Amino acid sequence: MEFKLKHKDGMARVCEITTAHSTFLTPVFMPVGTVGAVKSLDANDMKNELDAKIILANTYHMYLRPTSKVVKDFGGLHGFTKFDRSFLTDSGGFQAFSLSKNSKHFNEGIEFKSHIDGSHHLFTPKSVLDTQYDFNSDIMMILDDLVALPATKERVKISVDRTILWAKEAITYHKSMQNKGIGIGQNIFGIIQGGTDYEERKRCALSLNEMPFDGLAIGGLSVGEENALMYETVQNLNPYLDENRPRYLMGVGTPEDLVENVERGVDMFDCVMPTRNARNGTFFTSFGKFNIKKAEFINDHEAIDPACSCYTCRNFSRGYLNHLFKAKELTFFRLASLHNLHYYLELARKMREAILNNSFTQFKRNFYHLRGK
């Protein structure tokens, strides 16, 4: 991976990241392709309609089905999905924690039951990397020990101890595998845990900073805490993060979350919110969000967002989309997902532009003004 810090405006940053499959600027939003596809969209949509440079796929889901061996047989994620730009794969730890009713965390790894057939599995720091080697993802995430918030101080300390232990095991294993010719061209990110405990977050960040990860992620936020506490936690971490590595806030979030955390120095984001909300009829726009199922849109000839240049807004009216949603027409999911993802990707582009122009503060003011805030 090549990383260049191009410009700063306060804490907000524009960076250039080059992997084996694409070059992209940050702040960047990564659409989530949980099972190897962004829901209702294909590789052509991602490249030609949205111009996404990097997307996320989920290790837990693709490990269980179709299995990493099947994906490897197709030439990795790029050959399997035909998306030939960058892939980031998470470790699967969050899904093992959240989808399995009886997951167990111990120092060797995470034991869990498949949500598909109830079979028993064990994720370890080494095994999740082996799975991601099969995927040939451009950026691999290490296994970390996530805790739901609120959590006791003792449980947070155990989480940080375990995450540091697993990080050491993962980076040592990755370097040894690269020496054997495996994982060449693949990059590895560490994950900082610690809940909202300042000292534990600091301890975890300082420990991971000493390890030769290609980037660092902030995990374990947006899992039950108030937004203000999330923003404070990210801001407090800033002095302890290496300026010359990417910073990735995992699983976050709303448009407001992106703006607030870019202001606090975050480079990379992912979230299922744009596509999940699309399937429920909720659209993100420059003036806020609204749900298309309301009767007021039946005869509305306007585009979802007159200021938007996405395929959906260029071609279809609110009235038509209201009809498709109420008719449960599958076409709706694609059109709504295209719009919401375009909105998120365009928001990231506008933030990059504002940072480069030293006008991020004004951008943020206008962002909230359009929402009546």
From Swiss-Prot:
Keyword Disulfide bond: no
Cofactor(s) recorded in Swiss-Prot or TrEMBL: Zn(2+)
Positions bound to substrate: D90, S91, G92, G93, F94, D144, Q193, G220
Cross-referenced Gene3D superfamilies: Queuine tRNA-ribosyltransferase-like
Reactions catalysed according to its record: 7-aminomethyl-7-carbaguanine + guanosine(34) in tRNA = 7-aminomethyl-7-carbaguanosine(34) in tRNA + guanine
Binding partners and assembly: Homodimer. Within each dimer, one monomer is responsible for RNA recognition and catalysis, while the other monomer binds to the replacement base PreQ1.
PANTHER family referenced in this protein's UniProt entry, alphabetically: QUEUINE TRNA-RIBOSYLTRANSFERASE CATALYTIC SUBUNIT 1 (PTHR43530:SF1)
Protein name as it appears in the record: Queuine tRNA-ribosyltransferase
Organism, as annotated: Campylobacter jejuni subsp. jejuni serotype O:23/36 (strain 81-176)
Encoding gene per record: tgt
